[in-house]
UniProtKB/Swiss-Prot annotation:
Phosphotyrosine modifications at: 22
Catalytic activity of the protein: 5-amino-1-(5-phospho-D-ribosyl)imidazole-4-carboxylate + L-aspartate + ATP = (2S)-2-[5-amino-1-(5-phospho-beta-D-ribosyl)imidazole-4-carboxamido]succinate + ADP + phosphate + 2 H(+); 5-amino-1-(5-phospho-D-ribosyl)imidazole-4-carboxylate + H(+) = 5-amino-1-(5-phospho-beta-D-ribosyl)imidazole + CO2
Pathway it works in: Purine metabolism; IMP biosynthesis via de novo pathway; 5-amino-1-(5-phospho-D-ribosyl)imidazole-4-carboxamide from 5-amino-1-(5-phospho-D-ribosyl)imidazole-4-carboxylate: step 1/2; Purine metabolism; IMP biosynthesis via de novo pathway; 5-amino-1-(5-phospho-D-ribosyl)imidazole-4-carboxylate from 5-amino-1-(5-phospho-D-ribosyl)imidazole (carboxylase route): step 1/1
Positions of region (Linker): 261-266
Residues annotated for CO2 binding in this entry: 332
Lineage: superkingdom: Eukaryota
Protein name according to UniProt: Bifunctional phosphoribosylaminoimidazole carboxylase/phosphoribosylaminoimidazole succinocarboxamide synthetase
Any one GO molecular-function label of the UniProt entry: ATP binding
Naturally occurring in which organism (per UniProt): Mus musculus (Mouse)
Length: 425
């Protein structure tokens, strides 16, 4: 049950088919998005009251936005507000629906005769549609969007902004696709919208992502579809048909909270040869924390106490938690190779290189006997990232943070390039 939140609601700013947006008098720059108990299809050509849909939609959106925010995606979401609404930063909405597809189905097949249903896109295919109910939301090209010269909250939508939204759409889809896989659900396609935050002037994921926003097939089987397509496919809307649709929506709402957790545990154990390397190790631990990975620090020397080194190693091997060992040893690195030669777990050597003997010392981490498979990464942050990439193969939450980090790095470079180009004009 959501905690009751008292808000001072002002005027209605917008009303759509399935939601209303209100200003919040006590928090300038924030709005309330109120969902409706209404379901529509075909630009509201079909429209029905569906008791409980507002709460279902709000729960799904709140969980999905929380998942994306925690991954590092910039999202117009502050917190859930009761069962049927949430508070968000106020945005000026960009009137484009961004669609990302992994599997060809639905309208794509109608617009592209000859493509077989089930064709898979690698990478996912991104399309855009101008929000215009009177013209059935026509598909737009990138060139049309740029030529429109839209300006929202003072931000002109040009090539840079279009590229950012396109890349973000793909990243968001891939994160949600990966998140649904542990539930044995295939995310087939998805539509999202972006807005410009009126306070920060940044492009952010906005509006909602609920069961109207995607196609979701349990076990990859279209006949088991749980999304709004089950409503679109009704030849005639009957009370029984609506009840079936509601059960599908409830099925998704019951499982969406599971996306915020991972059944796959993970842990990084950093073994340092001396406490003089503690600062180097703390950087690794901090970087692991950015990926949500628990990290423990231990002190042991493979040269001076190999028996204790192997005992510590066995301690972590014995509790069943997937672990990556990171060895931090200066001068002659015996720690990483000894660990790697005596465990089936991944080992990363991250030696603290010094200016005087670093060029010579690093060879003890690089030139190793046969049968030793530890990698060497000099950057503390890089070693944590490599550990995250290992865990991300089976942990969707870690993978989501990695994917969002890639996107955010790309966006920062794109924005820096735009700023430099503007200075050169």
């Amino acid at each position: 049950m959501a905690t009751a939140v008292v808000v001072n609601i002002g005027k209605k700013l917008y009303e759509g088919k399935t939601k209303e947006v209100y200003e919040l008098l006590d928090t300038p720059g924030r709005v309330l998005l109120q969902s409706k108990d209404q379901i529509t299809a075909g630009n509201a050509a079909r429209k029905n009251h569906l008791e409980g849909k507002a709460a279902i939609s709000n729960k799904i959106t709140s969980c999905i936005f929380q998942l994306l925010q925690e991954a590092g995606i910039k999202t117009a979401f502050t917190k859930k507000c009761g069962e049927t609404a949430f508070i968000a930063p106020q945005c000026e909405m960009i009137p484009i629906e961004w669609v990302c597809r992994r599997i060809a189905t639905g309208s794509f097949l109608k617009r592209n005769p000859g493509v077989q249903e089930g064709y898979k896109f690698y990478p996912p295919k991104v399309e855009m549609f101008f929000k215009d109910d009177a013209n059935n939301d026509p598909q737009w090209s990138e060139e049309q969007l740029i030529a429109a010269k839209f300006c929202f909250a003072g931000l002109v939508i040009g090539q840079t902004e279009v590229d950012i939204m396109s890349h973000a759409t793909q990243a968001i889809f891939e994160i949600l696709e990966k998140s649904w896989l542990p539930q044995d659900c295939t995310l087939v396609d998805m539509k999202i919208e972006f807005g410009v935050d009126v306070t920060t002037k940044e492009i952010v994921l906005a509006d909602v992502i609920d069961n109207d926003s995607w196609r979701l097939w349990p076990s990859g089987d279209r006949s088991q579809q749980k999304d709004k397509q089950s409503y679109r496919d009704l030849k005639e809307v009957t009370p029984e048909g609506l009840q079936m649709v509601k059960k599908n929506f409830e099925w998704v709402a019951d499982r969406v909270e599971l996306l915020l957790k991972s059944d796959s545990q993970c842990r990084v154990v950093v073994l340092m040869g001396s406490t003089s390397d503690l600062g180097h190790c703390e950087k690794i631990k901090k970087a692991c924390g950015n990926f949500g990975i628990p990290c423990e620090l231990r002190v042991t020397s493979a040269h001076k106490g190999p028996d204790e080194t192997l005992r510590i190693k066995a301690e972590y091997e014995g509790d069943g938690i997937p672990t990556v060992f990171v060895s931090v040893a200066g001068r002659s690195n015996g720690l990483g190779p000894v660990l790697s030669g005596n465990t089936a777990y991944p080992v990363i050597s991250c030696p603290p290189i010094t200016p005087d003997w670093g060029a010579q010392d690093v060879w003890s981490s690089l030139r190793l006997p046969s049968g030793i498979g530890c990698s060497t990464i000099l950057s503390p942050e890089g070693s944590a990232q490599f550990a995250a990439q290992i865990f991300g193969l089976n942990n969707h939450l870690v993978w989501a943070k990695l994917r969002a980090s890639i996107l955010n790095t790309w966006i920062s470079l794109k924005q820096a390039d735009k700023k430099v180009r503007q200075c050169n004009l």
